[in-house]
């Protein structure tokens, strides 16, 4: 069974996240096309301090199970500032598959909960609805899988974080982005340049993702109308041509000379 993506990668970073000034940022993007297909993109980036304090981190990251589950993996690769980044993508053929994939990103403690994307209406006039909530439960426990918690009796390094007086929000950042087709009817996120974004609170505060957009495909509507119009004109042209031919033949028959006896 595939371990949750954020849990999977974050487990490799957990040992060094607790060190002062280290940081890991995750961006999850749901991109939906007008026809309902699209892509989910997950980008996880560790800063330079993590790489310096854990030089073997790059080799420790394992993604074989993610690849087996259909995710495309790029990296981990070096960033310009000396950090590491890994990118995971997965295409989907419709909202139902997208909902399933969103469920693979994090565990039951967060940060993504009850994520659902639906589509209603017609191809040329459809409404997309995004539901769910962002919430991190239990601090670092949100980034450890059940097997690890059962083995250790709790999230690893919690005592170190508490002893160091570190704020989880200073060490971990998660942003969820939604790129949905059409005009935004309502959303709880920040919308800019066609992207709706939410920042995941690290203090356990729940954030609703309630969003609705309506997509009216004007080009397709015009195309369909034009097709009907052209067919109608063609039909009229055929009828007019038949009538004209009939009138010409009738006129010729009237002008035909009477044979002499």
Question: Predicted segment positions?
Answer:
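Structured domain cores in non-transmembrane regions
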Residues: 48-132
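Bacterial N-terminal signal peptides that target proteins for export
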Residues: 1-10
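C-terminal single-pass membrane-anchor helix
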Residues: 219-261
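Post-signal peptide N-terminal segment of mature Sec-exported envelope proteins
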Residues: 31-48
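Bacterial signal peptide processing site
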Residues: 23-25
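Intrinsically disordered, low-complexity linkers and stems that provide flexible hinges
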Residues: 123-229
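C-terminal motif of bacterial Sec signal peptides marking the signal peptidase cleavage site
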Residues: 18-21
């Amino acid at each position: 069974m595939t371990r949750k993506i954020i849990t999977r990668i974050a487990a490799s970073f957990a040992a060094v996240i607790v060190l002062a000034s280290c940081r890991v940022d995750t961006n999850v993007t749901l991109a939906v096309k007008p026809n309902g297909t699209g892509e989910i993109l997950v980008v996880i980036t560790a800063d330079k301090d993590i790489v310096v304090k854990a030089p073997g981190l790059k080799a420790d990251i394992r993604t074989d199970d993610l690849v087996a589950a259909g995710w495309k993996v790029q990296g981990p690769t070096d960033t310009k500032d000396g950090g590491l980044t890994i990118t995971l993508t997965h295409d989907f053929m419709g909202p139902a598959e997208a909902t399933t994939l969103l469920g693979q990103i994090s565990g039951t403690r967060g940060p993504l909960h009850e994520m659902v994307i639906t589509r209603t209406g017609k191809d040329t006039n459809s409404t997309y609805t995004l539901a769910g909530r962002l919430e991190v439960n239990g601090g670092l426990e949100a980034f450890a899988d059940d097997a690890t918690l059962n083995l250790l009796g709790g999230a690893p390094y919690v005592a170190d974080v508490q002893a160091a007086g570190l704020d989880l929000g200073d060490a971990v950042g998660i942003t969820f982005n939604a790129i949905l087709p059409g005009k935004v009817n309502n959303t709880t996120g920040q919308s800019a340049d066609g992207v709706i974004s939410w920042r995941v609170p690290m203090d356990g505060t729940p954030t609703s993702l309630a969003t609705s957009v309506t997509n009216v495909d004007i080009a397709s509507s015009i195309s369909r109308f034009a097709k009907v119009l052209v067919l109608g004109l063609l039909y009229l042209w055929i009828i007019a041509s038949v009538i004209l031919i009939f009138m010409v033949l009738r006129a010729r028959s009237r002008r035909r000379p009477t044979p002499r006896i």
